[in-house]
Amino acid sequence: MASSSSSSRWSYDVFLSFRGEDTRKTFTSHLYEVLNDKGIKTFQDDKRLEYGATIPGELCKAIEESQFAIVVFSENYATSRWCLNELVKIMECKTRFKQTVIPIFYDVDPSHVRNQKESFAKAFEEHETKYKDDVEGIQRWRIALNEAANLKGSCDNRDKTDADCIRQIVDQISSKLCKISLSYLQNIVGIDTHLEKIESLLEIGINGVRIMGIWGMGGVGKTTIARAIFDTLLGRMDSSYQFDGACFLKDIKENKRGMHSLQNALLSELLREKANYNNEEDGKHQMASRLRSKKVLIVLDDIDNKDHYLEYLAGDLDWFGNGSRIIITTRDKHLIEKNDIIYEVTALPDHESIQLFKQHAFGKEVPNENFEKLSLEVVNYAKGLPLALKVWGSLLHNLRLTEWKSAIEHMKNNSYSGIIDKLKISYDGLEPKQQEMFLDIACFLRGEEKDYILQILESCHIGAEYGLRILIDKSLVFISEYNQVQMHDLIQDMGKYIVNFQKDPGERSRLWLAKEVEEVMSNNTGTMAMEAIWVSSYSSTLRFSNQAVKNMKRLRVFNMGRSSTHYAIDYLPNNLRCFVCTNYPWESFPSTFELKMLVHLQLRHNSLRHLWTETKHLPSLRRIDLSWSKRLTRTPDFTGMPNLEYVNLYQCSNLEEVHHSLGCCSKVIGLYLNDCKSLKRFPCVNVESLEYLGLRSCDSLEKLPEIYGRMKPEIQIHMQGSGIRELPSSIFQYKTHVTKLLLWNMKNLVALPSSICRLKSLVSLSVSGCSKLESLPEEIGDLDNLRVFDASDTLILRPPSSIIRLNKLIILMFRGFKDGVHFEFPPVAEGLHSLEYLNLSYCNLIDGGLPEEIGSLSSLKKLDLSRNNFEHLPSSIAQLGALQSLDLKDCQRLTQLPELPPELNELHVDCHMALKFIHYLVTKRKKLHRVKLDDAHNDTMYNLFAYTMFQNISSMRHDISASDSLSLTVFTGQPYPEKIPSWFHHQGWDSSVSVNLPENWYIPDKFLGFAVCYSRSLIDTTAHLIPVCDDKMSRMTQKLALSECDTESSNYSEWDIHFFFVPFAGLWDTSKANGKTPNDYGIIRLSFSGEEKMYGLRLLYKEGPEVNALLQMRENSNEPTEHSTGIRRTQYNNRTSFYELING
């Protein structure tokens, strides 16, 4: 159950309390992983040191904000004052905040915890000796232990496996969270009826893909209903309701970021990995190919036909896996007429309308009978529309009886047509300035970011922030998850209706339709009433008229959109606050304009060579946006702009210099000069207010001047790809303020100043691609908080020895060609304790280039040593206990694999190396589940690999047992052709395969099991051994949980081939045989979890005379068996000896 559905009082679902030295790397890490996989937001203090007695404030805050606390009592739990104080805090929060505490007794007796016996008694003896002056504190510990050990719902792992214990705890929490997260449904009026009908229509337990359309007018509650059914289906515990992925895509028609952004959001949510496709066609292809095997639940909310959303988001049923359900909400019935189901949402019946209105007007109880009667009058006017009931209820909330009567009388005396007119009462209840703000948002600012809107509104209206809060409180606008100011369509329609009440466009206060603006401009009908013109669409016929604009003395906001005007703009009203014009055709902006009120100037994609030549006094100006000004060579003088906050010069490709007066602008927050390819001179800047400085890809900028002023903690400086040769030391004068420094692809950078090592808060540092950088500062080890360091593609040959002091470093990369010289990594003993990923590929490493004690990197999970020249590897690699992935591809001189770490599950080597050591890989490294072979590009190589791998199984000296169910995935380096290695005799493509077995196929002590191969994604597979005759004989069944072989199984793809072995010892159950022999069973069936696969299968024997005789047999009949009806079968043709080399 997703934690987002939990009560807003909690920041976390679960807080984990544990003794690090006992369970951090075992039980607790597994529990944390399962909780996260279930979508349960869990706080685990990964970096806890457990020194001292006082727990940090942020840890106390996390405990207070967690809905559940899991306490893992282990043998040494009581030895830690940290843990005991943490427990005291947890039990306090249980009392204060009604949190749920779940104790787990990990290899300890609950009575030992409850009564402090055994190891707990010993720990308290030491505490009482050492802290004898803190009697009260010790007593608090004892009480907390006693209370925790007496709690219900505990788990004792002594009578169950770790997996069972974890499953019990996670199921317990999931169930409670599900009930809590769905509790909000109790407050949605009439929702039960909708849920019952929709769930029945969706027929969740039925196979196939279904698309349902929820249709109705705006404001009738379609989104609310869709969200409720979405949460309800996800909250069901029944297995038929389990989906592989789910996504609620809200307010689709308001999307302004392109179709591909919606596709990326949908794919990211469903696949649980970041999707970043740049156009809708790529996104469409990926959705069709990657979701077809996934059972998904999708809601596409508020679809219209403007941008053909359905075509690109749910174009075909074949896009989605069996059992998928797609729900669409829309006002346009014709968009969903071809779907399986259309569910119409109509107005609420009277009794539900009254209930909903009272919920918003009164909260709980109606004050008296007079309000009851007035409520019925309001409900009657609403005509059952939920939006109107909510808005009017909020409007009348906390008003006196006389005010109620006045508002209702106002409704009666104004015969508005339709609900839009009725919603106007909300507008009429606003102050005049708040009304003006509302109309600005409704007519042209809806969907813009909150900060941007406030800046425009504040330039026009006093108290804009307070006014926006009033609009939110009155349910007229709301802030979206993207921090955009949004409103319901009907509310927006109501605002536009108010403005359009006057018939003549020239007499209106606001215009937003291009054709109406064109009419006013061409007929010179502008008047003093005009306050704002905002054209967001392109118009090829819109022409600017100076005469028409001269009549608009009160014009505050003027956005001409993307017009093709070639008429000179000679006049703009002095009252203007915001001017926007895309494709501005002239080389300069008129110097005669006196725009002292101007706040926002945006002239993108213009023909400007310069904005103006003289100094302009613009005291109100906060934003200048001249991005994509391809002909602009210099900026204006900024001296007269003391309040300037944002300057956007992005992709001004001919801009050569920024005026030095920019350094006088102390309020600047953002400077955007990325991709200014010709920029050569940049002034000193004041960084007191600066939050972003973008100089990325400024190729010609070789020098960055000193900066002055105190940096803000959140400042971001992007210089990657620039031509800067050296960095000014003033950037690093404030030691705690920079957390990320990206310097990659700075081709001229020759050195880093030693002052960079003062950045004590630096978390991420990249000098990747700085091809002239030869060394690092000797004090690099002083960067105590550094977690990511990328020095790929540089000339660095030996990092400073101090680098091993970076004990918080997680990722370290020196990847890159060293041009004939050899890279050498310093000794690492007693250092780099947190390092998880080390990339030394392409480093021209030779023997001795790696430290012999590399095995001391205890946290290392991924090591990339590909394309190097060493002949041997340090033997201590075997001591890398956490290592999961090792890359040795294209190491041409490597002749011997070292002993591999025990936890390794992915190995990337060349094919010849894999074949040479396949016996070792198969028999000695059972946790190895994936081998990556970039150079295995033909069927012969795959056949050889399969033959060699399974030959090693047959050559095992011990008997094959159920535990020998080998699973190994081969990454091929290219999408695998539609072909399975021919060594597998039985081949096909289906979600299930049945193979008829020959007579006497089973030879005691000779038959080993079934060798199986299939392509594409790794899924669980079930093997069935089926009797020849239906003589009430039981099937033999074995489920192979292959998807659990690797925690990163989601990485498996069409580039992979999966080999696995079904041992006969694991399939055959003598207790079910009832005296029958294996030869009484004549069919082997494999089921691939409902997903179609390209498969191959082969029976596997030890060599011997009986086997040779069997292999000469042929099946006498090709008739299908009664057991395989409706399932694709592959007939048993001939079978060569396992030891015979590959056919073909």
UniProtKB/Swiss-Prot annotation:
Q: Name its cellular compartments.
A: Cytoplasm
Q: What is the effect of changing I63M?
A: Loss of resistance
In UniProt terms, what is the effect of altering G218R?
Loss of resistance
Q: Where primarily located?
A: cytoplasm
A molecular function (GO) term: NAD+ nucleosidase activity, cyclic ADP-ribose generating
Q: What is the effect of changing R325 to Y/G?
A: Loss of resistance
The protein's UniProt keywords, in alphabetical order, are: ATP-binding, Cytoplasm, Hydrolase, Hypersensitive response, Leucine-rich repeat, NAD, Nucleotide-binding, Plant defense, Repeat
Q: Where is the signal peptide?
A: none
Superkingdom of the source species: Eukaryota
Task: Give the positions the UniProt entry annotates as the active site.
Answer: E86
Q: Which GO terms describe its cellular component?
A: cytoplasm
What does the UniProt record report as the effect of altering G219D in this chain?
Answer: Loss of resistance
Q: Read off the SMART domains from this record.
A: LRR_TYP (SM00369), TIR (SM00255)
Its function?
Disease resistance protein. Resistance proteins guard the plant against pathogens that contain an appropriate avirulence protein via a direct or indirect interaction with this avirulence protein. That triggers a defense system including the hypersensitive response, which restricts the pathogen growth.
User: Other remarks on record?
Assistant: Isoform 1 and isoform 2 are necessary to confer complete resistance to TMV.
Protein name stated in the entry: TMV resistance protein N
| Source species | Nicotiana glutinosa
Record gene name: N
